[in-house]
């Protein structure tokens, strides 16, 4: 099992799909990395030599932001929006949808479980 960017990649998968298990790498970026490292997409993870794995690690480390660094950057970007007091920042702070969705009936994922209002018993 190859370990790249702190993630164990599944052995039986093709390397182009195996790399997508790393946070911040999708199929397009995976193919870019493999092209830069000169590795075939058809190769399976367990078929990688140590040199090829090192080439992938080097490419990711030098040219891509992944895993913890990317999570930290996203969190910092959201915090900056909140500190600015922008509309998007306020929506993040209140735990409501940020991208203009209606909230009268839906948005349960973002708002959480329903809070019943006005159903008091005598």
From Swiss-Prot:
Keywords: Ribonucleoprotein, Ribosomal protein, RNA-binding, rRNA-binding, tRNA-binding. Residues 95-116 have a biased composition (Basic residues). It comes from Campylobacter curvus (strain 525.92). Signal peptide: none annotated. Located at the top of the head of the 30S subunit, it contacts several helices of the 16S rRNA. In the 70S ribosome it contacts the 23S rRNA (bridge B1a) and protein L5 of the 50S subunit (bridge B1b), connecting the 2 subunits; these bridges are implicated in subunit movement. Contacts the tRNAs in the A and P-sites. This is Small ribosomal subunit protein uS13. Belongs to the universal ribosomal protein uS13 family. PANTHER family: 30S RIBOSOMAL PROTEIN S13/40S RIBOSOMAL PROTEIN S18, SMALL RIBOSOMAL SUBUNIT PROTEIN US13M. PROSITE patterns: RIBOSOMAL_S13_1 (PS00646), RIBOSOMAL_S13_2 (PS50159). It comes from the Bacteria. The keyword rRNA-binding applies.
């Amino acid at each position: 099992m190859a370990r790249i960017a702190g993630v164990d990649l599944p052995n039986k998968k093709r390397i182009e799909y195996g790399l997508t298990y790393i946070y911040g790498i999708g199929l397009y970026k995976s193919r870019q990395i493999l092209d830069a490292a000169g590795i075939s997409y058809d190769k399976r993870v367990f078929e990688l030599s140590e040199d090829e794995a090192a080439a992938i690690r080097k490419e990711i480390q030098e040219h891509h932001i992944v895993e913890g660094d990317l999570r930290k950057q996203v969190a910092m970007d959201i915090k900056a929006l909140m500190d600015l007091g922008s509309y998007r920042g306020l929506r993040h702070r209140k735990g409501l949808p940020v991208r203009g969705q209606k909230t009268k009936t839906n948005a349960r994922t973002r708002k959480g479980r329903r809070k019943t209002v006005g159903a008091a018993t005598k």
